[in-house]
């Protein structure tokens, strides 16, 4: 079984290793109440300046419904990345439905800060 072809607009796409790291961190940030689920919520965190980074699903249908986020991320200097599966992203977010975009948010004194920074650097390396 081959993986479905990913829309070329979904750039940068995380590889398998980074996807696992991302989804683990998304799951932890959900436990620490540092996660906003959904494209609209992600947009709000960007506008308020409280987004650490944005994770989007490359298999959102149609993809255009989340393609305003990369532009906003670039304006606000927030790293963003695509993962292949909205189902996997939904599971990592702790909901039973697919999630096409989520935002890990800033929180003072967060225990996740070191992991968040290492993921931000990994995403920024993809963007270069």
From Swiss-Prot:
Gene3D superfamilies cross-referenced by the UniProt entry: 3.30.1330.30
Subunit structure, as described in the record: Identified in the spliceosome B complex. Component of the U4/U6-U5 tri-snRNP complex. Part of the small subunit (SSU) processome, composed of more than 70 proteins and the RNA chaperone small nucleolar RNA (snoRNA) U3.
Record organism: Xenopus laevis
Region described as Interaction with U4 snRNA and U4atac snRNA: 36-48
Residues with site note (Interaction with U4 snRNA and U4atac snRNA): 61, 86
GO-annotated cellular components: box C/D methylation guide snoRNP complex; nucleolus; nucleus; precatalytic spliceosome; small-subunit processome; U2-type precatalytic spliceosome; U4/U6 x U5 tri-snRNP complex; U4atac snRNP
Location of the region described as Important for U4 snRNA-binding in the Swiss-Prot/TrEMBL record: 96-128
Role summary: Part of the small subunit (SSU) processome, first precursor of the small eukaryotic ribosomal subunit. During the assembly of the SSU processome in the nucleolus, many ribosome biogenesis factors, an RNA chaperone and ribosomal proteins associate with the nascent pre-rRNA and work in concert to generate RNA folding, modifications, rearrangements and cleavage as well as targeted degradation of pre-ribosomal RNA by the RNA exosome. Involved in pre-mRNA splicing as component of the spliceosome. Binds to the 5'-stem-loop of U4 snRNA and thereby contributes to spliceosome assembly.
Similarity comment text for this entry: Belongs to the eukaryotic ribosomal protein eL8 family.
Protein's recorded name: NHP2-like protein 1
SUPFAM superfamilies linked to this entry: L30e-like
Compartments in which it is found: Nucleus; Nucleus, Nucleolus
Alphabetized GO MF terms: RNA binding; U4atac snRNA binding
Disulfide bonds: none
Entries under InterPro entries matching the protein: eL8/uL1-like, H/ACA_rnp_Nhp2-like, Ribosomal_eL30-like_sf, Ribosomal_eL8-like_CS, Ribosomal_eL8/eL30/eS12/Gad45, Ribosomal_eL8/Nhp2
GO biological process, one term: mRNA splicing, via spliceosome
Pfam families: Ribosomal_L7Ae (PF01248)
Keywords: mRNA processing, mRNA splicing, Nucleus, Ribonucleoprotein, RNA-binding, Spliceosome
